[in-house]
From Swiss-Prot:
Subunit and interaction comment: Laminin is a complex glycoprotein, consisting of three different polypeptide chains (alpha, beta, gamma), which are bound to each other by disulfide bonds into a cross-shaped molecule comprising one long and three short arms with globules at each end.
Protein name listed in UniProt: Laminin subunit gamma-1
Location relative to the cell: Secreted, Extracellular space, Extracellular matrix, Basement membrane
Glycosylation sites: 60, 134, 576, 650, 1022, 1107, 1161, 1175, 1205, 1223, 1241, 1380, 1395, 1439
Single GO BP term: cell migration
Encoding gene, per UniProt annotation: LAMC1
Length: 1609
């Protein structure tokens, strides 16, 4: 089929309905022609019915056919009529485009000239009744169908049917039957009809289109409304509206029409019967129920209506959510039936259609989710238990208390009706003094006024207690407090008990006592001081009976209380200090220190007007101050209750300010301090009586009982009491110092050791713990803990062993003569070339040195090792043996050894230098390994006879080339001591740029001159044609004429010569003729000079243009110079970035290795007894802190390494851009060089042309002058006119000469300027090349910096290793001290040697710092540009400082420390693996590093960290050595204190609950991992959806089609 988007208009009318259909079709066509997007409203904007345009809904829509010919290919024949006529047969092949007849041809464009059709298989393949073929058309959306038309390519079927579906998932409904046997085939009456009132949705059957003729081109048109009685009232017929609605159309072909000849089963006949349809058209409109004028594709590529009239849905079949005021209806011609909005009074955006409401009110919109607490179908009233003050305001909740109000509904003002005893607008609270709101009202409060504040809680009745009071009614003191009284702002007084007990009560037997001064007799011990503490005068008045101070300056003076007010005044705590005071002037200036109390190292003060006191005045006023720390009495600084009582318990000073202005006086009287004392009188209830714990005694727990001592003696009664620690050798001790009275040969403050000359374990607690030492002379001894063997501990220097029978490490000899005669132990002699801290430096028997350092060897380390040279006995290690460093290429047999004294290597022939690393002058090729070869430079051609040390290329004279400078360069000549000269042959005029030996060039035809740069006579230079061209033939006459003029000129010159001599006489006529001839020649010369002038002017114009061009080129060169400078800067930055990045990786690796080694080396065992004087607990603690610090550094390194990895990519990208910029610069330089050569050639051409013009003009001028001279020498035989003309000629010649001179001068100036520009350009080019070379060297410098950083890292690691070795030795030393006291004393004697080793280690550290400093210097360049990095570094430093402080505050138990270190080591190993992976990534991306200004700063910080780490480690070792050096003065009390602190630290470690925190972190990590997995799953689902959408998009058509109206022909 070649179908059309528009259905065929020519349907044959039949029946009574066709005129109506014609009118409807015409109206539809007119409506579609004027269809527009806004036709759903009329010109006044009122809604009206609108419909999409009438279209062929089947156009280009895919039809699904259940049978199609061509698979496999088959033959069919065209039916031509009666039997016997020859049939025309063809082939149907689905694989051949021109032979296929697929279902797509049913709905394609209908072209009558080229008909296409769908075709089924033939009857030969079994296509005939009862088998059927279905053609199914899926419209993709509901349409209002007007007709269905089929055009058959063969004869029409005998029987076929049309079906439709109203919904895509609905059943197939018969639409129409066509059959010549309706009753037999479809059980339908033939040509039936529908009566009025009948079922208008039934399908009819007709035989009208079932004839076999025509054999082709037969049409079948089905009109959906034809024969339906309600078609004239379609808008009011829901049955017909449903009838015309279809989403799918199916045509079922049931039986073929035949001539009956198929009964003979002739294959050719059977091949002529088949179904073939050329056009399948469905006329209708997209179904939108009158509420849309168009349909369009949605986001899912589905066809939907573009709904108006507040409707929505695929077919506009529903009202929008808020437009439910009336039921949805289909639009009609009379009414648009648009959906109307609900009336919710602006308080809701949601509603639904309420049929009951619609029937009762005419408005069916029932609002939901009313806002502002409104209710009703239209949100017109407040909800229950809500109110509003105005109709336009929101409703507010009454909030009436359900307990305290009589009703939950309030009045229009929001006030509730309260029950008796309840108050408030909401009846939600009790009246003052009542509590517990219930159904019966509120109950009265029952608070104790001494311990409560204000009223009770209105909900629970619980009273609000003072700070130190508890109980429902605040009727008792909290534990640790006593003496409940109303005057106390805290209610109760805290127990003091010197901090040892929190249980106390009121003491019995104490009465009120006042300490006072009334000044009736004298000043009563009071004195005065100035502000700085110096004494001041005090006056006592017998008349006023007071004391006074007078100030003559602005600085105040104070009254100082006497001793009776001081001392132990803790019984005045919570009581008052009062005095009477006045001043003589009202001008007062108060301060925060008007009343000052001092004691127990504490100091508090208050202003005079504090605690409600008045300003000082001229009238005597009594001032009262309560001695209490409560905030109501603002003593500053604020103290705790215990601190305030501690101050009063040792009160050392009371100061009362006396003067408050300059030159004023203050008067003090009646000072009273309330206190208490034992005895009868008014009871003093504020005195405590403590209940003391075990070991304490006294009313205030201020004493230690017998058998107990002060834990910290210098704290006095504030120190805790602990049991006497005498190890069973004493039952009592001094209660203040704790020193035991030892017996049983024990000694020490706690009897913790044996007396001198005794050995044993005095801590066992028996009388036989200490036994006499078996050593000679009763010297000291010790017991080996494991073997219990007694060994002597005070052997002579250099000896060791259980009985001093062996030489100590570092000594040799045979003290017992076991290997010969007895030889005392002597110090090893190794020429100071051993490490004094090392073990086994020499053989203890022979003294042979075994561990020589500084590259030395020999029995006494007295010579250099092979491959080294120098002085092995030099005092400075740096001056000892150094590596030979012989050059492998220049040394005989590639030896690495040299003279052990001078270091001179054995060189190959013609090789020189101590390391054989250079060739002799005039030789080269050291890399050959066979010695250097002679340069053989030519004596004349080379400059100095030297050559390149690698290539052998000699340095040649200008213009000379060759390996040995033996020949001229191309286009040069004249080989000699000054070099070769350039031929300078003109490229156009010479046959070759190479000249002859005399420098002359071979010229082309028409050129002359040594350089072939001039045209031959009668030749001219044509710019548009290369070379000198011969002048046209006419110029030969000129040449001849010139030859004649030359002959005549010679004759004239001869004549003038003859006139001068007078040898020949000339007649007047002859002279006149010759004069006229001369005049003509002069005129010709003048014309030639004028022509030369014009040529010169043209030349000047050309020179001006050249100058302009040169200026622009110079400007561009300047830009290129700037680019080169920027490129150099960028290259320098890139070099620094690469260098810093590489160094950063090395530093990170080194820091991790250091942390790992340090962490692995801190596993120390705890000594068995902390009371041992040789205990090395401090050493173990320092090791633990060292491990913690290295762990922190390792964590920092991991983070820094990751940052370095990230920033390395940026650094490399910058380097690539820099190199790309350098390549671009090199290209621009090359281009500029080429343009410069072009400009230079043009300038040279102009110079040559100017020179030729100059020569021609000069010759012309000379000739003119000569002619004038000749004329001037003639006798005045002619007229005056001739003379004037001659003068004019002379003047013109002079002017011409001046003009030529001026032009020549301008040209020379221009040429000089050109030379300057040329030099400047050459310099710029050279500078560009230099900058490029500098950029090329940056990578080499980066490599060198990397090597330097690696060397620095190596030195740092070596230094750290040496320091660790020292630490290990010290740990070993710790073990030996515990085993043998004698060995410990010997180690103390070695401390100077150890200090020397530390000095050498410091020296090596400084060397490492210097090596690291070179890397840090480069990084410092970015310091000012990295404020953020500094902030980060500062934060890290603060964090490290905090960590160190925390480590110093806690001394963890050594065994727990070992476990912690093991865990930390595992973490370090994991961090190392992670860092290794990061480093591998960094190595792969090393050359892709980027702008690393931040990375450079971080590299500097890390370099500094490395340096500080080494320095800190050495400092720790020095501290440890100092502590080792002080072992002989061990403080046993200090050791006990450390042991106690260690136990506290252990408790703190347990309290910190690290295991739980780690577990929590692991759980959080698992949660995060699960969340990440969920995110990954979501991402996978989203990606699947995206891929599905992409597949859908690919199946969509690439465009839309806008075809003509369906009703147009």
């Amino acid at each position: 089929m070649r179908g059309s988007h528009r259905a065929a208009p020519a349907l044959r009318p039949r029946g009574r309905l066709w005129p109506v259909l014609a009118v409807l079709a015409a109206a539809a066509a007119a409506g579609c022609a004027q269809a527009a997007m806004d036709e759903c409203t009329d010109e006044g904007g009122r809604p009206q019915r609108c419909m999409p345009e009438f279209v062929n809904a089947a156009f280009n829509v895919t039809v699904v056919a259940t049978n199609t010919c061509g698979t496999p290919p088959e033959e069919y024949c065209v039916q031509t009529g009666v039997t016997g006529v020859t049939k025309s047969c063809h082939l149907c092949d689905a694989g051949q485009p021109h032979l296929q007849h697929g279902a797509a041809f049913l709905t394609d464009y209908n072209n009558q000239a080229d008909t296409t059709w769908w075709q089924s298989q033939t009857m030969l393949a079994g296509v005939q009744y009862p088998s059927s073929i279905n053609l199914t058309l899926h419209l993709g959306k509901a349409f209002d169908i007007t007709y269905v038309r089929l055009k058959f390519h063969t004869s029409r079927p005998e029987s076929f049917a049309i079906y439709k579906r109203t919904r895509e998932d609905g059943p197939w409904i018969p639409y129409q039957y066509y059959s010549g046997s309706c009753e037999n085939t479809y059980s339908k009456a033939n040509r039936g009809f529908i009566r009025t009132g009948g079922d208008e949705q039934q399908a009819l059957c007709t035989d009208e289109f079932s004839d076999i003729s025509p054999l082709t081109g037969g049409n079948v048109a089905f009109s959906t409304l034809e024969g339906r009685p309600s078609a004239y009232n379609f808008d009011n017929s829901p049955v017909l509206q449903e009838w015309v609605t279809a989403t799918d159309i199916r045509v079922t072909l049931n039986r073929l029409n035949t001539f009956g000849d198929e009964v003979f089963n002739d294959p050719k006949v059977l091949k002529s019967y088949y179904y073939a349809i050329s056009d399948f058209a469905v006329g209708g409109r997209c179904k939108c129920n009158g509420h849309a004028s168009e349909c369009m594709k949605n986001e899912f590529d589905k066809l939907v209506c573009n709904c108006k009239h507040n409707t929505y849905g695929v077919d506009c079949e529903k009202c929008l959510p808020f437009f439910n005021d009336r039921p949805w209806r289909r639009a009609t011609a009379e009414s648009a039936s648009e959906c109307l909005p609900c009336d919710c009074n602006g308080r809701s955006q949601e509603c639904y259609f309420d049929p009951e409401l619609y029937r009762s009110t005419g408005h069916g919109g029932h609002c939901t989710n009313c806002q502002d607490n409104t209710d009703g179908a239209h949100c017109e009233r407040c909800r229950e238990n809500f109110f509003r003050l105005g109709n336009n305001e929101a409703c507010s909740s009454c909030h009436c208390s359900p307990v305290g109000s009589l009703s939950t509904q309030c009045d229009s003002y929001g006030r509730c009706s309260c029950k008796p005893g309840v108050m408030g607008d909401k009846c939600d609270r009790c009246q003052p003094g009542f509590h517990s709101l219930t159904e019966a009202g509120c109950r009265p409060c029952s608070c104790d006024p001494s311990g409560s504040i204000d009223e009770c809680n209105i909900e629970t009745g619980r009273c609000v207690c003072k700070d130190n009071v508890e109980g429902f009614n605040c009727e008792r003191c909290k534990p640790g407090f006593f003496n409940l009284e109303s005057s106390n702002p805290r209610g109760c007084t805290p127990c003091f008990c010197f901090g040892h007990s929190s249980v106390c009560t009121n003491a019995v037997g104490y009465s009120v006592y006042s300490i006072s001064s009334t000044f009736q007799i004298d000043e009563d011990g009071w004195r005065a001081e100035q502000r700085d503490g110096s004494e001041a005068s005090l006056e006592w008045s017998s008349e006023r009976q007071d004391i006074a101070v007078i100030s003559d300056s602005y600085f105040p003076r104070y009254f100082i209380a006497p001793a009776k007010f001081l001392g132990k005044q803790v019984l005045s705590y919570g009581q008052n200090l009062s005095f009477s005071f006045r001043v003589d002037r009202r001008d007062t200036r108060l301060s925060a220190e008007d009343l000052v109390l001092e004691g127990a190292g504490l100091r508090v003060s208050v202003p005079l007007i504090a605690q409600g006191n008045s300003y000082p005045s001229e009238t005597t006023v009594k001032y009262v101050f309560r001695l209490h720390e409560a905030t109501d009495y603002p003593w500053r600084p604020a103290l705790t209750p215990f601190e305030f009582q501690k101050l009063l318990n040792n009160l050392t000073s009371i100061k009362i300010r006396g003067t408050y202005s300059e030159r004023s006086a203050g008067y003090l009287d009646d000072v009273t301090l309330a206190s208490a004392r034992p005895g009868p009188g008014v009871p003093a209830t504020w005195v405590e009586s403590c209940t003391c714990p075990v070991g304490y005694g006294g009313q205030f727990c201020e004493m230690c009982l017998s058998g107990y001592r002060r834990e910290t003696p210098n704290l006095g009664p504030y120190s805790p009491c602990v049991l006497c620690a005498c190890n069973g050798h004493s039952e009592t001790c001094d209660p203040e110092t704790g020193v035991c009275n030892c017996r049983d040969n024990t000694a020490g403050p706690h009897c913790e050791k044996c007396s001198d000359g005794y050995y044993g374990d005095s801590t066992a607690g028996t009388s036989s713990d200490c036994q006499p030492c078996p050593c000679p002379g009763g010297s000291s001894c010790a017991v080996v803990p494991k073997t219990k063997e007694v060994v002597c501990t005070n052997c002579p220097t250099g000896t060791t062993g259980k009985r001093c029978e062996l030489c100590d490490d570092g000594y040799f000899g045979d003290p017992l003569g076991r290997n010969g005669p007895v030889r005392l132990c002597r110090l090893c002699q190794c020429s100071d070339n051993i490490d004094p801290n090392a073990v086994g430096n020499c053989n203890r028997l022979t003294g042979e040195c075994l561990k020589c350092i500084y590259n030395t060897a020999g029995f006494y380390c007295d010579r250099c090792k092979d491959g080294f040279f120098g002085n092995p006995l030099a005092p400075n290690p740096a001056d000892k043996c150094k590596a030979c460093n012989c050059n492998l290429y220049g040394t005989m047999k590639q030896q690495s050894s040299c003279n052990p004294v001078t270091g001179q290597c054995e060189c190959l022939p013609h090789v020189t230098g101590q390391d054989c690393g250079a060739c002799d002058p005039g030789f080269y090729n050291l890399q050959s390994g066979q010695g250097c070869e002679r340069c053989d430079c030519h004596a004349l051609g080379s400059t100095n006879g030297q050559c390149d040390i690698r290539t052998g290329q000699c340095e040649c004279q200008p213009g000379i080339t060759g390996q040995h400078c033996e020949r001229c360069e191309v286009n040069h000549f004249g080989f000699g001591p000054e070099g070769c000269k350039p031929c300078d042959c003109h490229p156009e005029g010479s046959l070759s740029l190479q000249c002859k030996d005399d420098g002359r060039c071979e010229c082309r035809e028409g050129f002359v001159g040594n350089r072939c740069d001039q045209c031959e006579e009668n030749y001219f230079y044509n710019r548009s044609w290369p070379g000198c061209q011969e002048c046209p033939a006419c110029y030969r006459l000129v040449k001849d004429k010139v030859a004649d003029h030359r002959v005549k000129l010679q004759e004239l010159e001869s004549l003038i010569a003859n006139l001068g001599t007078g040898d020949e006489m000339v007649t007047d006529q002859a002279f006149e003729d010759r004069l006229k001839e001369a005049e003509r020649e002069v005129m010709d010369l003048l014309r030639e000079a004028q022509d030369v002038k014009d040529v010169d002017q043209n030349l000047m114009d050309r020179l001006q243009r050249v100058n302009n061009t040169l200026s622009s080129q110079i400007s561009r060169l300047q830009n290129i110079r700037n680019t080169i400078e920027e490129t150099g800067n960028l290259a320098e930055q890139a070099r620094a970035h690469v260098e810093n990045t590489e160094r950063l990786i090395e530093i990170a690796s080194r820091e991790l290795e250091k942390a790992k080694v340090a962490a692995a080396n801190v596993s120390v065992t705890q000594p068995e007894s902390t009371g041992d004087p040789n205990n090395m607990t401090l050493l173990a603690e320092e090791a633990r802190k060292l491990a913690e610090r290295h762990k922190q550094e390792a964590d920092d390194i991991v983070r820094v390494a990751k940052t370095a990895n990230d920033t390395s990519t940026e650094a490399y990208n910058l380097l690539l851009r820099t190199l790309a910029g350098e390549n671009q610069t090199a290209f621009e330089i090359e281009e500029l060089n080429r343009k410069y050569e072009q400009a230079k050639n043009i300038s040279q051409d102009l110079e040559k042309q100017a020179a030729r013009v100059h020569e021609e003009a000069k010759r012309a001028g000379d000739k003119a002058v000569e002619i004038y001279a000749s004329v001037a020498q003639l006798s005045p035989l002619d007229s005056e006119t001739l003379e004037n003309e001659a003068n004019n000629i002379k003047m013109e010649a002079e002017n011409l000469e001046q003009l030529i001179d001026q032009k020549l001068k301008d040209y020379e100036d221009l040429r000089e300027d050109m030379r300057g520009k040329e030099l400047e350009v050459k310099n710029l080019l050279e500078k560009g090349k230099t900058e490029q070379q500098t950029a090329d060297q940056l990578l080499a410098r980066a490599d060198a910096a990397k090597a330097l950083a690696e060397e620095a890292a190596k030195k740092g690691r070596d230094t750290l290793q040496e320091a660790n070795d020292i630490l290990n030795n010290l740990k070993d030393f710790d073990r030996r001290v515990n085993d043998n006291k004698t060995a410990a004393e010997e180690a103390l004697r070695k401390i100077p040697a150890i200090n020397q080793t530390i000095t050498e280690a410091n020296e090596k550290t400084r060397e490492a710092q210097q090596a690291l400093g070179s890397a840090a210097a480069d990084a410092t360049e970015a310091k000012n540009k990295a404020h953020e990095a500094e902030r980060i570094a500062s934060a890290v430093q603060k964090n490290a400082t905090s960590t160190k402080a925390e480590a110093e505050r806690t001394f963890a138990e050594v065994t727990d420390l070992d476990n912690e270190v093991n865990n930390m080591l595992k973490q370090l190993q994991e961090a190392e693996k992670e860092l290794k992976r990061k480093q591998d990534d960094a190595d792969q991306d090393m050359m892709m590093a980027g702008m690393a200004s931040q990375a450079a700063q971080e590299a500097e910080i890390n370099a500094r960290k490395a340096k500080n780490s080494v320095t800190s480690l050495l400092s720790i070792i020095n501290d440890l050595l100092e502590q080792l050096g002080q072992l002989d003065t061990v403080d046993l009390n200090k050791l006990n204190e450390i042991e106690g602190t260690l136990n506290k630290a252990k408790d703190e470690m347990k309290v910190s609950d690290l295991d739980r925190k780690v577990s929590d972190l692991e759980n959080e990590a698992k949660k995060q991992e699960a969340a990440i997995m969920d995110y990954n799953r979501d991402i996978e689902e989203i990606m699947k959806d995206i891929r599905n959408l992409e597949d859908i998009r690919k199946t969509l058509p690439s465009g839309c089609f806008n075809t003509p109206s369906i009703e147009k022909p």
